[in-house]
Amino acid sequence: MLRRAARVPILTWHASDVAGPDHGSNDHVAFREDLEHLTRLGLRVVPLAAIARSLARGELSSLEGCIGLSFDDGTDFDFHDMPHPQWGPQRSMSNILADFRARHGKDTQPSLHATAFAVVSPEARRKLDEACLIGCRWWHDDWYAAAERRGTIAIECHSWDHNHASLSDSVSRAPRGGFMIDNDADAEAEISEATRVLRTLRKRDGDVLFGYPYGDVSDFLARDWFPRRAESLGIAAAFSADDEEPVHASSSLWAIPRFTARHQWKTPGELERLLREAGALPRPLGRITSLFARRAAIATTVPAAEALPDWRDYFQTWEVNDAKALAGELFRKSFGHDIPDMAHHYVLVYSPPAGSDDVQPRIVAYVHQLPKEGFHLCGGMCVDERAYRTFPKWLFGQVRDAGGLATLVTSDSMQMLGDSPAAFGYVGDSKARAADLRTGFVDTGIDLLMVKWLKPLPEEEKRRLVERAAALMPF
């Protein structure tokens, strides 16, 4: 079995953000242009519910090359075409989706869908309409059921009243203008009641998704309240905002990351760069249906330095079952014995560019991970140093600048660890130590033992985990 370290981006827009006629000032223009550009990039739109489901089941790799779309606040602009007194008629987000389908047909983006996270309280919406919009009554709930029936927008929960700074009162006692809830009473008031009422308004039972107001994720909600209460309330997942990464295998189900329009990109080109830097774009040159099946060469021209292909297009990290058959020889050359039995084995696959003497994909690095109670052990990292000599000069330079093959396979495998607070490495040579340092590992104070902290922990808990990992050396 091969499984790639999938990275699935989720984007969000605010339909009420209408401050001009162009992409950087109007989220309707931005959404229309972004949707076209995402399609040209080869990304496949899937519902947020599908992303949450795949993450919960440990099947995110099935969504490689996919993307999720969402809108925040749930104003009427999401569903109705609205006249803006300064900037004229605004095509609704729902109708922008319909226009896309009419232009391209059902075969392009067959799963076209978006999620609207709505503020549920009618009174809060009325007050926020006056305070935050321009008092034109643009914030109703009478369209929720119609949107659900249309089938391209799901209405989900953005809390009872957003705990908004513009409100004179809120059901939450948390500081206004944020959502850092830290107790059961406030969580029940903002989320439980909103979830119940939302099901009635949208006329659809079943699971609810939650979008954190302001993207504020408190430790109490993500690590305590949602894990305790979500199942009984029928809440399937919770989504943050303004994040710096796409969804990956170790993302928390209660803090699924999203990127936000205008905050993080203002043109389709900026969006493409954001996704490329996050490793979230499809990698057509690295797609292989059978690891050792030859593939047709893909023409690549390199006319100038600024036009160089991205080195990541030629490398993929996979989790494999039969590591001894795939990477056993490489491991034996490095360590003098067979690959040990471990829970998780990862290989880095290199697919040479067109024009190379051999376009056969091959394994150039290996690492394994062993889960323990409360942490992971990372070891066995080895690299086929001969591979560097076969890289084109431009590719060699990019890989070197990125930290090398060891850094890549270690970093990718860390993305696939799952919900773990720490990863420990047993580091026996200077090259492995350098790669671990580039990946975020630090010294523990114990010879040869390094650690990467994946979650904030009290110092006492860190010391306890270090002692437990040290007792397992070597690994």
Task: Walk through the language-model features, giving the residues of each.
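Acyl-donor binding region in acyl/amide transferases
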Residues: 376-440, 444-446
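Active-site beta->alpha N-cap acidic-glycine motif
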Residues: 15-152, 163, 200, 206, ...
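Short, solvent-exposed beta-strand-terminating loops
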Residues: 1-3, 8, 155-167, 368-388
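Terminal substrate-recognition subdomain of acyl/acetyltransferases
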Residues: 299-307, 419-475
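Hydrophobic faces of well-ordered beta-strands that scaffold small-molecule active sites
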Residues: 9-11, 69-71, 114-116, 155-158, ...
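His/Asp/Glu-enriched short active-site or ligand-binding loop at hydrolase and phosphoryl-transfer sites
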Residues: 52, 201, 206-209, 214-267
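Alpha-helical scaffold elements lining the catalytic groove of polysaccharide deacetylases
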Residues: 139, 145-150, 161-202
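A conserved beta-strand-loop-helix scaffold within acyl/acetyltransferase catalytic domains
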Residues: 309-313, 318-386
